[in-house]
Amino acid sequence: MSLSKVFSLISFNRFMLIPFMIISLMMPACMPTPSIMKMKPEYYPQCYQPFEDLEQAKRDLISRTLIGAGLGAVSGAVVGGVATGNVKGAAIGAGIGALGGALVGYVHAKRSQYKNDKERMRSYQADMNADMRNASRVEQYAMTSLQCYTREFNTLLKKYKKGELSKEEVQARYKEIREGMTYIAEILKDSKDKLVQRDEEYREAFAFEARTKNRPAPEVASLEKKREAAAKRRPSANVKGDGSRELRKVSTEANTRKVQAERNAQKVEKQEAAMVAAAEKKKGTSSIKTVSKYYEKQYLNSVVSLEEAENVNDRTLAAMSVAAKHAGIDMV
């Protein structure tokens, strides 16, 4: 091997260290919040119990984002390094690649892995199904915990009014309830944000696949318009009276959402099984337009549903604050 080739190989390897450094810096942002994860339930372990399932559902939902960013960072480093011939150029390329990696990396990874159109369309649908199933599980477990905390909060107030617990004891328990509810809020927001990011991935895939066939990108309903329409239908966040009526209302809502989320997850699992059966028979669509319609009909609702669950959690916290203030134990 010539000396020039040795130096070229060293330079290339030096460039390739950069994307991995960037991904290592990105990883903490995808991890659960340490302060929340260190929470040790002293009074309500039964309400904390679903959190393990909640965390797993969230991890399943976000795992593909980091992989896509990694692919983008690697390709960006190569392009940047080749274009400029130095480490700085590779670093800039890796950074840009990481930001766009979830979009470009996803599409190109699919096309590299699946040359057959039907197999690739099935793969897109499989990803959508996995995202929808995990999102439904996140909502199901979140609403289970929310219901538990609401029930315990109501019991706490009753005991305090009867003089069975001191103000200090009640506040300690109330603090744990709010910590758990805050954790639920963070999980729901993180999961919803990932689905919104995936929306960009899928739309990019639809457009790219259409371009390869010299066809216009399929028209897909706007996610933002769907979210705006849902927001207009939400109940008022204002809490009237002592908050007890609102607590009953949101608890009922949470139960409805929990049941529906479980049904949605089961529905997706059946769809996944049907897709596997179709794949074994070498059936399925090769049309990106068909896949985009499937996406529009089902996936967008998953984003809105998580946003609705966020709203229920926020309204529950607001009602708790009002009820606690009326009882004389408010701390926030």
Q: How would you describe each model-predicted region?
A:
Residues 54-115:
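Short, low-complexity, glycine-enriched hydrophobic/amphipathic alpha-helices that associate
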Residues 3-17:
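Bacterial N-terminal signal peptides that target proteins for export
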Residues 25-29:
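C-terminal motif of bacterial Sec signal peptides marking the signal peptidase cleavage site
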Residues 9, 31-65, 106-332:
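Helix-termini ("caps") and immediately adjacent flexible loops/tails
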